[in-house]
Design a protein with these regions (language model features):
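Von Willebrand factor
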Residues: 1-9, 12-148, 152-155, 161
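Sequence contexts marking disulfide-bonded cysteines in secreted/extracellular proteins
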Residues: 5-8, 72-74, 91-93, 171-173, ...
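Short basic/glycine-enriched coil/helix segment immediately N-terminal to the Walker B
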Residues: 10-12, 147-148
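N-terminal post-signal-peptidase region of extra-cytosolic proteins
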Residues: 33-42, 135-138, 180-187
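Mid-length scaffold segments of soluble, non-membrane domains
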Residues: 146-155, 165
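VWA/integrin I-like adhesion module and closely mimicked acidic/polar interface patches used
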Residues: 160-188
Length: 188
């Protein structure tokens, strides 16, 4: 495996891509909900070993300029789990080495989680959610191609697009409310 990426050298097993919307300020409860589903133990329980994991923010950055902020393959734990190949194969793998790699992966992903979820109270001037979605699906730089037999795109967003060409907010607001660029009245 590539030491910095934890990925197998000659195969692509699967790819889970997390696209997280930071265009509206998030409340602490929303941050907790997001982190509880896309980081830490949740990754180990829901994503098989050696599947690639990538994270990208939806924010004020131009879609073509946005970078994938973290991309690594999930290291195996060495313990038995629901996933085939998770347990150390004593015939050809060293258990201590597997544990060391998993600990390195866990440390890097924990450090990244803190960086990624910082500044969750900022507000963007636009929300080009669908452009980001198309970018991930179409652009080779995302490495979200059919070369992976299993692909999953996870979008953490209210899916409320707003930009110059198209805005959901203009369809759900009165003229007086249009002064608030990314707020929509309650649907209750």
């Amino acid at each position: 495996a590539e030491p910095e990426q934890f990925c197998p050298l000659n195969t692509k097993v699967g790819h889970t891509f997390f696209l997280v919307d930071f265009t509206s300020p998030l409340k602490k409860a929303q941050v907790d909900w997001i982190t509880g589903r896309i980081f830490g133990d949740s990754l180990i329980k829901t994503i098989p070993p050696y599947h690639k994991i990538s994270y990208m923010k939806i924010d004020d950055t131009k879609v073509q300029s946005q970078e994938i902020l973290f991309t690594k393959c999930r290291a195996k734990t060495g313990n038995k789990s629901q996933f085939p190949g998770e347990k150390t194969n004593d015939k050809c793998e060293g258990h201590d080495r597997i544990i060391k790699l998993h600990d390195a992966f866990a440390f890097l992903s924990s450090k990244f989680e803190k960086e990624f979820m910082a500044n969750y109270e900022l507000e963007a001037s636009k929300s080009l959610i669908f452009e980001y979605l198309f970018h991930v699906l179409r652009e080779p730089v995302s490495d979200f191609t059919s070369e992976y037999p299993v692909r999953e795109l996870v979008i953490a967003s209210d899916l409320m697009q707003y930009g110059k060409r198209f805005s959901f907010y203009s369809h759900c607001k009165t003229n007086l409310e249009l002064s608030k660029p990314n707020k929509c009245k309650s649907f209750e």
